[in-house]
């Protein structure tokens, strides 16, 4: 039955679904996990990178990209689709800065990306973007924001969220572990993001990519050694938690 309605993006199935959009969401669910945490004075984005083939040149295919000096984006899904979206968003940020003489707000650029995605769900001869985006950064007033957009064109703001493979598991982890006091500083926000990735990372700490954005400062990508230090702290805390549980029993 579904094959009658999934050949065109503009045709609804009898039960009210746009099957091509749902297929795009499935492409996101098969993508590498991406997480975002909004702290009191920073925004942290983290992704799990795919392992590089043995004979492949280890060129960096970053899943965390700058859209403007104050806006950073991570994504899950089809990398080629993300490349097009990133280029469009970067041009829009530059155009806005030239025309209005002010940088874009986080909601403005998120809405632009969401509207572009939505257009591709109503146009013949096109297909939806197979990516979900986590967009973080700071507005001119210094307030931090973290948004997520879906292939359907909807977007929401979050304190912490995840997308991609095992996103549901990570969201449940955030719901249990996110505390305002825990992310009051950069250290706590980074630790929470890395711990969330470790919950689902198939290759452990080896292929994690973490970026920190602070207001008025350039984006900072964490070195592998720094991530390893955080992992050691997290493992030590887990051991202490297990020890406390054993003592209670």
Curated annotation (Swiss-Prot):
Protein name: Proteasome subunit alpha type-7-1
Record-stated family: Belongs to the peptidase T1A family.
The organism of origin for this protein: Drosophila melanogaster
UniProt xrefs under Gene3D superfamilies: Glutamine Phosphoribosylpyrophosphate, subunit 1, domain 1
Keyword Hydrolase: no
Known function: The proteasome is a multicatalytic proteinase complex which is characterized by its ability to cleave peptides with Arg, Phe, Tyr, Leu, and Glu adjacent to the leaving group at neutral or slightly basic pH. The proteasome has an ATP-dependent proteolytic activity.
One GO cellular component term noted in the UniProt record for this chain: cytosol
Quaternary organization: The 26S proteasome consists of a 20S proteasome core and two 19S regulatory subunits. The 20S proteasome core is composed of 28 subunits that are arranged in four stacked rings, resulting in a barrel-shaped structure. The two end rings are each formed by seven alpha subunits, and the two central rings are each formed by seven beta subunits. The catalytic chamber with the active sites is on the inside of the barrel. Interacts with PI31; this interaction is reduced by PI31 ADP-ribosylation.
Subcellular location: Cytoplasm; Nucleus
Gene Ontology biological process terms, A to Z: proteasome-mediated ubiquitin-dependent protein catabolic process
Chief place where the protein resides: cytoplasm
Keywords: Cytoplasm, Nucleus, Phosphoprotein, Proteasome
